[in-house]
Amino acid sequence: MSLADSVLAVNNDLPIRTDSPVHSGKVRSVYWLTDADSRRLIKTKGYNVPEDTPLAIMVISDRISAFDCIFHGEGGLKGIPGKGAALNAISNHWFKLFAENGLADSHILDIPHPFVWIVQKARPIKVEAICRQYITGSMWRAYSKGERVFCGITLPEGLEKDQKLPDLLITPSTKGILTGIPGVPAQDDINISRSDIEANYQAFGFEKLEDIDLYEKLLKDGFKVISKALADIDQVFVDTKFEFGYVTDKDGNSKLIYMDEVGTPDSSRIWDGAAYRDGKILENSKEGFRQFLLNHFPDPDVLLNKDRMPEREALARDNDLPLEAMMQVSRTYTGVAEKVTGAAIPLPANPKADIIKILREEYDLIL
């Protein structure tokens, strides 16, 4: 079995029984189960949700995206070995830690395979919940050019690149393109303020005005739980993105939960603690891959300029990245996962065949 065979690059073609189109994201694909299969699993597996809750199989891939494009490597390598399993393992660990600390639930009901979650359908909040503890990345670039107000928050003068911020900052942006909201352009990833959310809370998916306080509390509390755990293994939790949504519990009440992934190298910046104390930045996240791309291609503006998206897409499509660069990302992701979870990350030789076998034999979901 070759290295390329061990990578799950295409994850939207599994023969899972569904009566809806498969939703394919940059990294994950979602298979909505039939009503009959959802009800059967809720009953036979004992999931603690209402019996009419729609369920889905969420399958992660090993694809690597950056700057809104999917990249690939030499030798037919269409993804990063171990990346999908590492991301899921990290999220699973943090969700468990959240539960132990009395925070909200997640959308995950079952974990049949390292690449697979069984999730309940949620009503998503249309906000990318971003939390920052250090000034770096896009915030630093804007600050260095004179900007001081970010998402309605004024930063002090005299901050330096990569330094710790005086307070943990919440800098939300829009999730998807939202129309008809005063003062908010109909574009993806537009920075918004808490005032924007309060004035239009229902348009952003909040059911109650006071849930804005709850979302901010869950964001900050989740950040602090992960930050403390990472500090224990000498890693710095720099910034991250969470997602939230509502589900209905067995008593018919709405509750706010964590969605998607949390605290991973894809959704966060994580720095090596020893290097940071020495005045250096050693990325243990996707940011290292982004920096590689900016240095690898002769015209980095293609990757940064949104007006050059067709060129960027062609660049990603037509260039095989060096194998060593892809394997460095693999080492970063699996290394962080092993530090966080304290366990080796399984790398199945043929993940697709394994997934099909488990979903057939243990869940009866394969056509």
Curated annotation (Swiss-Prot):
InterPro entries: SAICAR_synt/ADE2_N, SAICAR_synthase_Vibrio-typ, SAICAR_synthetase_CS. GO terms for molecular function: ATP binding; phosphoribosylaminoimidazolesuccinocarboxamide synthase activity. Keywords: ATP-binding, Ligase, Nucleotide-binding, Purine biosynthesis. It holds the Pfam family SAICAR_synt. SUPFAM superfamilies: SAICAR synthase-like (SSF56104). Gene3D superfamilies: ATP-grasp fold, B domain, Phosphorylase Kinase, domain 1. GO terms for biological process: 'de novo' IMP biosynthetic process. Pathway: Purine metabolism; IMP biosynthesis via de novo pathway; 5-amino-1-(5-phospho-D-ribosyl)imidazole-4-carboxamide from 5-amino-1-(5-phospho-D-ribosyl)imidazole-4-carboxylate: step 1/2. Its EC number is 6.3.2.6. It is an enzyme of class 6 (ligase). GO terms for cellular component: cytoplasm. It comes from the Bacteria. It catalyses: 5-amino-1-(5-phospho-D-ribosyl)imidazole-4-carboxylate + L-aspartate + ATP = (2S)-2-[5-amino-1-(5-phospho-beta-D-ribosyl)imidazole-4-carboxamido]succinate + ADP + phosphate + 2 H(+). NCBIfam families: PRK13960.1, purC_vibrio. Belongs to the SAICAR synthetase family. This is Phosphoribosylaminoimidazole-succinocarboxamide synthase. It comes from Shewanella sp. (strain W3-18-1).
